[in-house]
């Protein structure tokens, strides 16, 4: 279950101010 969780919440865990990848930003803005 740990593996699935880590793969299911990859951008969710680093979505706050961790804006490191351009993809994360796009996913975040699309979800929010």
Swiss-Prot record:
InterPro entries: Amanitin/phalloidin (IPR027582). Residues 1-10, 18-32 form a propeptide. Disulfide bonds: none annotated. One of its GO terms (molecular function) is toxin activity. Coiled coil: none annotated. Belongs to the MSDIN fungal toxin family. This is MSDIN-like toxin proprotein 2.
């Amino acid at each position: 279950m740990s593996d699935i969780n880590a793969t299911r919440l990859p951008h969710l865990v680093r979505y706050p101010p961790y804006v490191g990848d351009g993809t994360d930003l796009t996913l975040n803005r699309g979800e929010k």
